[in-house]
Swiss-Prot record:
Pfam families noted in UniProt: Cytomega_gL
Organism: Murid herpesvirus 1 (strain K181)
Main location, first listed in the record: virion
Signal peptide (from-to): 1-21
Alphabetized UniProt keyword annotations: Disulfide bond, Fusion of virus membrane with host cell membrane, Fusion of virus membrane with host membrane, Glycoprotein, Host cell membrane, Host Golgi apparatus, Host membrane, Membrane, Signal, Viral envelope protein, Viral penetration into host cytoplasm, Virion, Virus entry into host cell
gL betaherpesvirus-type domain: residues covered: 51-251
Subunit structure: Interacts with glycoprotein H (gH); this interaction is necessary for the correct processing and cell surface expression of gH.
Function summary: The heterodimer glycoprotein H-glycoprotein L is required for the fusion of viral and plasma membranes leading to virus entry into the host cell. Acts as a functional inhibitor of gH and maintains gH in an inhibited form. Upon binding to host integrins, gL dissociates from gH leading to activation of the viral fusion glycoproteins gB and gH.
GO cellular component term of the entry, any: viral envelope
The name this protein goes by in its record: Envelope glycoprotein L
Family statement drawn from the similarity comment of this UniProt entry: Belongs to the herpesviridae glycoprotein L (gL) family. Betaherpesvirinae gL subfamily.
Gene: gL
InterPro entries assigned: Cytomegalo_gL
Length: 274
């Protein structure tokens, strides 16, 4: 099955290709985006007929380089600084000895994401759920007092420091409290692509956060079903869903498999005559 991220990128490419297929602008002249003939997916009417007007205005403003006003105060555009997704919830570790940290370019780039970052705590929690989690746990281990809880850390921006108990943060089940760019469906791993940014150092990076969330897999299935339905593709999605039992062993259990398929597929059983 095509990775979901690739599928979304292809859809975006169709949108940009349709917009760029119009007459080429004269050299030195910047044209305004014409949104009247843009099609995203095969359908009988332009996308304008079904897209809310504020979204069209935001797309045109972004393309034409004018000042952009966010439609919402939180979510992927501007995350709520006081809420964190359970996807990056801190998990206490026990009995693990600190290991030497591998100081390579990847670690130094991640370190630049933290330096004087006003959203330092969010970036730190996200990095602690990536493939370099053990390095960051070892790095933070030297900054706790002997009698301090292992879940307490300090963030410092411009020499002003704050204390945080990672076990008592305001966590929410809303995935899009973070800067989510997409989903990476690559069996046997299901990951969320998260954008990390430091406005102070102008550093940014996209990291993969592995997840074993059943609701995430269910949401991915529903999204694929919707996209394939718009494209009129004849795909046995139920069969694909059942194959996930073997392709995502970290996500599925027998009871979970029954739970996720029940709401999409209800087999009709015939009663046997006595």
């Amino acid at each position: 099955m095509m990775p979901l991220l690739l599928l979304i990128l292809l859809s975006t490419r169709n949108l940009l290709g349709a917009a760029q297929s119009q007459e080429s602008p004269v050299a030195g002249e910047r044209r305004a985006l014409d949104l009247t003939t843009v099609y995203v997916l095969p359908r009988s009417e332009p996308i304008n007929a079904t897209v809310e007007h504020k979204c069209r205005e935001a797309l045109a403003s972004c393309y034409n380089g004018s000042e952009f006003q966010p439609l919402h105060d939180d979510g992927p555009i501007r995350p709520d600084p006081y809420r964190f997704s359970t996807m990056i919830r801190f998990k206490r570790s026990y009995g693990e000895l600190p290991l030497p940290i591998e100081l390579n370019d990847e670690f130094l780039e991640q370190l630049s994401l933290l330096h004087n970052n006003t959203d330092q705590l969010r970036v730190l929690l996200t990095l602690m759920r990536t493939s370099r989690a053990s390095d960051w746990m070892s790095f933070l281990g030297g900054y706790t007092q002997c009698d301090a809880p292992k879940s307490v850390v300090f963030t410092c921006v411009e020499s002003v420091c704050y204390e945080h108990d990672l076990m008592r943060l305001n966590y929410t089940t809303d995935l899009f409290t973070e800067n989510v760019l997409g989903l990476d469906v690559s069996p046997p791993v299901l990951s969320v692509l998260v954008l990390l940014r430091n406005n102070h150092t102008k550093a940014e990076s996209v990291v993969r956060v592995p997840t074993s969330s059943m609701s995430m897999l269910d949401g991915t299935y529903n999204l694929l079903r919707t996209i394939l339905g718009h494209m009129s593709l004849d795909t046995d999605l139920i069969g694909v869903l059942r194959s996930y039992r073997d392709r995502f062993p970290a996500v599925f259990s027998v009871s979970d498999q029954i739970k996720i398929t029940r709401q999409h597929y209800r087999p009709q059983y015939q009663r046997k005559r006595p």
